[in-house]
């Protein structure tokens, strides 16, 4: 684990401001680092326009009033200075290191004065909430800047912590928007750019993935034509960087900085990913045969978009009109559906599309959202629900949908079922705010995690049996990342801030029993919480890390 140990032995002079010390109590340290998560792409000219268009720091979830400590010895430069992050902020200079640290969204103005000396580990402030409610978005926003307070650096490269470990929460990976002209750029927590206050928008990509559904005057194609070339029926890329290697539990199928956000094909024989493997290869979807990875990746298609579950249709935006185009793959016929400049999702049977419309300028904590459903050919558009902070969770059997609604004046949520046939709502129960909800394959079991609750007994990973007459949450014996394997088996990776490798376990929702999947260890670190279970439940694909660098795509065989 030499490479792993270097994660906390390089020149990282800063300690964490509240994690992992606060994490065991609050179970809420999920880092959101720099660059641009896909959901924030549209804010690069507004919220983040003054700082290069990127989220230029790290967000650390914590309940209001959590103590913040100085990340290093320093001198207070300003309290509530012109540095954003309301309602209060604090800037501390570290002249001996050549950096400054900025703490934002504080509960109250710190009781400090400019010029005052602070010591590393000394309590200097309390966490607050951007919405100033303490139930909206309580977190600390931390930036590392230069001493001129202009250049902003990636905190992961300067804070003495293992961010791959801290990212292991919930059911989804930490992904980033992609520049389609350089699809491997800025795709890990450690590989993030610097930004400058007042500097250019560095993520104003000409071609971005996921596609931007908003209307634009620019009518260029969605993908760079010069990088697409699918004339040949089969294109084989050059072999991946260096020879493929093995670990105690699995094998590498692609090397180098390849293959973030991978997914499986339906028959579990191939892992696919968006890539341009080398300068002589086209941009598009590639796949590697997990049984014969030495043959290299095979080009699948240059067509990017949202595919229906049965692969009969593909959806993509017409940005000149702000509408969605649906294309039937069999004959290329297309038609337009007005999804109000929002990306749609296909229904599980591929016969309809669903989208949520809302005002971008409205505060996200209380904005009105409308849920729409239309037949896949665009006919019969109908409003399913008009509400505030009601989010679709998953499709259920019998033409029903599971949703979660924020309780006004609280972080609690009400879980309810919406009938798509008559609009009837059936409330199940009210719960503390649920995060990263995931449904088992048969839609019976719901797993989620809770954090940031004052009563620490409410924090943790929870299981809900939706087929029970009166569903009651059951606390699970772990906290970390999780994915469903099948109808009743949940695979999880415990979140340990000090782990030197990542271990997989399986929890059986029916029996309540857990087992280690790889008792001899994996010898691997998962990057970005980026891993997927094959549809047949026999394999795990993951993006690995070696120190601060990505280490390719790996496959682990699950033995029963």
Where are these regions (language model features)?
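Zn2+-dependent peptidoglycan hydrolase active-site motif and core
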Residues: 71-110, 114, 133, 137-143, ...
């Amino acid at each position: 684990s030499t490479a792993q140990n270097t994660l906390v032995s390089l020149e990282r002079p800063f300690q964490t401001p509240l994690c992992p010390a606060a994490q065991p109590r609050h179970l809420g340290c999920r880092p959101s680092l720099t660059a641009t998560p896909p959901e924030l792409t549209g804010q690069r000219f507004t919220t983040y326009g003054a700082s290069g268009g990127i989220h230029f720091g790290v967000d650390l979830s914590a309940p209001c009033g959590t103590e913040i400590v100085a990340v290093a010895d320093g001198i207070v430069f300003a309290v509530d200075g012109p540095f954003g992050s309301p309602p209060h902020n604090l800037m501390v200079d570290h002249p001996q290191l050549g950096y400054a640290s900025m703490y934002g969204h504080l509960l109250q103005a710190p009781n400090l004065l400019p010029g005052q000396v602070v010591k590393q580990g000394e309590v200097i402030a309390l966490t607050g909430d951007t919405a100033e409610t303490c139930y909206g978005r309580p977190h600390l926003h931390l930036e590392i800047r230069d001493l001129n307070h202009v250049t902003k650096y990636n905190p992961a490269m300067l804070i003495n912590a293992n961010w791959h470990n801290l990212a292991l929460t919930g059911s989804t990976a930490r992904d980033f928007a992609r520049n389609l002209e350089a699809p491997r750029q800025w795709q890990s927590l450690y590989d993030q750019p610097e930004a400058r206050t007042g500097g250019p928008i560095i993520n104003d990509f000409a071609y971005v993935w996921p596609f931007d559904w908003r209307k634009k005057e620019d009518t260029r194609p969605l993908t760079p034509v010069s990088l697409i070339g699918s004339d040949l029926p089969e294109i084989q890329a050059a072999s991946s960087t260096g020879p493929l290697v093995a670990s105690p539990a699995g094998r590498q199928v692609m090397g180098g900085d390849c293959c973030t956000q991978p997914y499986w094909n339906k028959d579990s024989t191939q892992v696919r990913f968006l890539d341009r493997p080398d300068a002589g290869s086209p941009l598009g979807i590639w796949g590697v045969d997990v049984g014969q990875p030495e043959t290299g990746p095979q080009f699948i298609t240059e067509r990017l978009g949202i595919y229906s579950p049965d692969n009969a249709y593909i959806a993509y935006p017409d940005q000149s009109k702000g509408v969605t185009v649906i294309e039937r793959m069999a004959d290329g016929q297309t038609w337009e559906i007005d999804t109000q400049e929002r990306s749609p999702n296909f229904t599980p049977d591929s016969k309809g599309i669903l989208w949520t419309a809302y005002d971008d300028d409205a505060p996200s904590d209380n904005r009105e959202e409308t849920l729409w459903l239309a037949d896949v050919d665009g006919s019969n558009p109908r409003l399913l629900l008009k509400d505030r902070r009601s989010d679709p969770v998953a499709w259920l059997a019998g033409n029903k949908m599971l949703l979660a609604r924020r309780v006004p004046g609280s972080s609690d949520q009400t879980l309810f079922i919406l009938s798509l046939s008559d609009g009837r709502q059936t409330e199940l129960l009210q719960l503390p705010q649920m995060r990263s909800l995931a449904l088992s394959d048969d839609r019976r079991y719901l797993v989620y995690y809770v954090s940031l609750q004052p009563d620490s007994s409410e924090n943790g990973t929870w299981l809900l049996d939706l087929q029970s007459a009166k569903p009651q949450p059951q606390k699970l014996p772990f906290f970390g990342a999780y994915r469903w394997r099948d109808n009743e088996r949940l695979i999880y990776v415990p979140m340990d801030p000090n782990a030197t490798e990542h271990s997989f376990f399986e929890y059986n929702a029916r029996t309540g029993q857990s087992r280690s999947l790889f008792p001899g260890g994996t010898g691997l670190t998962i990057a970005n919480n980026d891993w997927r279970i094959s549809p047949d439940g026999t394999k795990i694909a993951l993006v690995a890390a070696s120190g601060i660098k990505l280490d390719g795509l790996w496959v682990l065989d699950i033995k029963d």
